[in-house]
Amino acid sequence: MKKYVLDLKVVSVEALSDKHVLIKLTDEKPLPEILPGQFVEVRVDHSPTTMLRRPISINFVDRENNQLWLLVAMVGDGTRQLGQLKEGDVLNCMLPLGNGFTMPTGKSQKYLLVGGGVGVAPLLYFGKLIKDFGAEVTFLLGARKDTDLLELDEFAKIGKVCITTEDGSAGEVGFVTNHSVLENEKFDMISTCGPKPMMVSVARFAKKAGVECEVSLENKMACGVGACLCCVEKTTEGNQCVCKDGPVINIKKLTWEI
């Protein structure tokens, strides 16, 4: 796919928690084609410690309003600076990058999208496209506590939402792989994004259940185009750059011990 470097205008910055913001961006021209699971590399201005662009998952593409949504966890100088953006500011973005999730091929297919923490970000757009295609989508979202759950109202507009929290403050207590939906329902595809230990557990469940599974890897990235080799992941096809060959990879290609 063709890549673009665009100066996108900030429409709004909404605080979703004390450490997460939702940034909505727009452009004068229609946004380019974007696949679910792809990401952007954003340039962070006014941060003396942030020389490299920051990779951010594409949370949603609102074609009706020509908006691109980015869900940002403010964990360092660069992302905290992004949280200070205001309406009318300009954010330089390189996009779309990487490969996306596999779309359903039949309307009878049932997809389970599993997200943990800010890893829920790419699942919103993916779920919307699955719904628009006519297939069935269920979300399984996990967090440490209820205040860490993000965009629940948006997910509920698309499909069934199942929740786990480690402290039991919302949904079922425990990790996502402990949720009863995994015992009570059958799925044709599981797609997941979040902390690696969570994705390993989800991949292990999928392999045991004989269900196709894709994971969206969150390796440390710099260039975003496969040049610097800092995001390399070992696969059955050799070392691959997560930014270029991923971030979405079928678990059959991974060398994880599952």
Regions found by a protein language model. Name each.
Residues 77-218:
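FNR/FR-type flavoprotein reductase catalytic core
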Residues 12, 60, 163-165, 215, ...:
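Structural signal for conserved beta-strand scaffold positions within catalytic alpha/beta enzyme cores
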Residues 4, 239-258:
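Short, basic/aromatic-enriched C-terminal tail that caps enzymatic domains
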Residues 48-56, 98-105, 243:
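Short, Lys/Arg- and Gly-enriched loop/turn segments at beta-strand edges
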Residues 45-47, 96, 236:
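Short, surface-exposed secondary-structure boundary micro-motifs
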Residues 196, 218-247:
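Local cysteine-cluster metal-coordination motifs and their immediate loop/turn environment
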Residues 2-87:
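Ferredoxin-reductase
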